[in-house]
Amino acid sequence: MNINKIALIYNHNSKHLAIIEEIKKLYNYCKIEEAEVIIVIGGDGELLHNIHRYMHLNIPFYGVNLGNLGFLMNPLDTKKLLQNIHESTVSILNPLLMQVEDTSGQIYTALAINEVSIFRKTNQAAKFRIEVNGIERMSELVADGALVATPAGSSAYNLSASGPILPLESNMLCLTPICSFRPRRWHGALLLSSATIKFEILNTNKRPVNATADFQEFNNITNVTVKSTKDKPVKLLFNKNHTLEDRIIKEQFGG
């Protein structure tokens, strides 16, 4: 990959400023709007925030992990950083498009790279009805919540909720309940990425529900519609010996 213009993004309040200063000295970085690659230094959260901020530019992102898990990031290797970027492989992520309506009738939309989740706002369990492609699949789910995850996000919140991990090229989505109370033994569903999933919240006055797309939260929701979109693809760069597909496979074996 022939790359000449690279932009650098990092948190100016990071506790790793000494390392960041080393990286800043490696290259004459350009403005973000002029870049062919955007380097994001930090953790998965920092990367996700900046993907949402700059995905409209259609520029590939290369994450350098200075956080904890860093599932979407590359390991820090200051000496080989530029070489690793030039030799990197590309993973294409298609985000989820979420549309929500709140109790006042206001409609909002948001994109999610990892997952869309809905969850109870009070101590009472949420109740909702689930449709897939316009067909009712569950008349009532009583749970703390539910989520729809992309393959890239299937190893995040979805995995913690006992959902399955999806291969990156699977063209599938995870629909996973969060602490399901009724039906107690329902563990979710695997759906084609072309599916449209709708949650209708039941008894919203007594059992209010919030919804999030990654980190964007909306309160007092009456219904949520989720579908994958190919209109806003995100390109992530990974070291050739440390691809996202490899990480997803490794995660399934407890790696």
UniProtKB/Swiss-Prot annotation:
InterPro entries for the chain: ATP-NAD_kinase_N, ATP-NAD_kinase_PpnK-typ_C, NAD/diacylglycerol_kinase_sf, NADK
Gene3D superfamilies associated with the record: Probable inorganic polyphosphate/atp-NAD kinase, domain 1, Probable inorganic polyphosphate/atp-NAD kinase, domain 2
Cited Pfam families: NAD_kinase, NAD_kinase_C
Positions with a binding annotation for NAD(+): 44-45, 49, 114-115, 144, 152, 155-160, 216
Active site, renumbered: 44
Subcellular location: Cytoplasm
SUPFAM superfamilies: NAD kinase/diacylglycerol kinase-like
Catalytic activity: NAD(+) + ATP = ADP + NADP(+) + H(+)
Signal peptide (UniProt feature, chain positions): none
Cofactor(s) needed for function: a divalent metal cation
Enzyme class per UniProt: transferase
Taxonomy, superkingdom: Bacteria
Keyword tags: ATP-binding, Cytoplasm, Kinase, NAD, NADP, Nucleotide-binding, Transferase
BP GO annotations: NAD metabolic process; NADP biosynthetic process
GO CC terms: cytoplasm
Primary localization: cytoplasm
GO MF term set: ATP binding; metal ion binding; NAD binding; NAD+ kinase activity
Family: Belongs to the NAD kinase family.
Protein task: Involved in the regulation of the intracellular balance of NAD and NADP, and is a key enzyme in the biosynthesis of NADP. Catalyzes specifically the phosphorylation on 2'-hydroxyl of the adenosine moiety of NAD to yield NADP.
Protein name: NAD kinase
Source organism per UniProt: Rickettsia peacockii (strain Rustic)
